[in-house]
Amino acid sequence: LSMGIAYGGPTLDQTGTTAQTNLDTALVRGGDQVVVKEAKDEAKPLFFGGKTAVTTKRSQVRSRAMSMAIKGIIAESADIYIMGHRYPDMDALGSAFGVARLASFNNRKAWIVLDENEIIPDVKRVLEAIKEYPELEERIISPKEAMKRKKESSLLVMVDYHKPSLSISQELYERFDKVVIIDHHRRGDEFPAKPLLSYIESSASSASELVTELIEYQSNSANKLQAFEATMMLAGIVVDTKSFNTRTTARTFDVAS
């Protein structure tokens, strides 16, 4: 059972809208909790409950619907920029390359934003290995280069995080009007104002698990994930599940296989 409670709005309609938003927040955080927030933009929400173990609440129908929705958004965008959190781990990197492949399925250029000054050792080793794959390496650009290339109708996809302050480049984030979020962390207070689509599933082991499911609904004989991309996404799942010892469900094993 989840509840969203709001109070103090100037109108009943605004208070009701805030209450619905609070309920949505409770659900994307995993459910079994109550979210209370005053109907003011600057107000901070209060969270009660949510202590139970997260169970698998998403369905294949929802995953397919999300895949088709993202496909439509990509088709309406000039190009795609993909950004993870600061000091990205393998899940952020793997899911970013997965989204880039989704963009290529739909004949759109995709760029993965990385800051060379914020690279952890595991990711650094992968970036060395990726030099053997020019098509993949050329997708990686700096925040500064991304700001030069961005067009008015460009799309930003946030992977493995949803708090703008955790962006590799918050300045770059603020340049985008079109934003999509793919994340597996419980939704917090800080959140983009008006994302085009928010796919947050706290029951998933990782962002790579979610992106793999999205790819499954768009791949065919002509559109396939490359072996190195699949390896990066599997590494993201392995890291976030501590080698399948935590936050692992039947769907995690299904995706990994």
Model-derived features: positions:
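Positively charged, low-complexity intrinsically disordered leader regions
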Residues: 46-77
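Residue-level recognition of beta-strand->loop/alpha-helix junctions
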Residues: 7, 38, 114-115
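A structured phosphate/pyrophosphate-recognition subdomain
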Residues: 64-67, 74-88, 95-108, 189-257
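Catalytic/regulatory signature loops of cyclic-dinucleotide turnover enzymes
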Residues: 2-4, 17-46
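Anionic-ligand anchoring segments at beta-strand to alpha-helix junctions in alpha/beta enzyme folds, i.e.
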Residues: 77, 81-152
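Alpha-helical/coil-rich non-catalytic "connector" segments in signaling and regulatory proteins
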Residues: 1-2, 6-7, 157
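Active-site cofactor/cluster-binding pocket
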Residues: 139-194
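Fold-independent oxyanion-binding glycine-rich loops
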Residues: 85-86, 116, 159-162, 182-185, ...
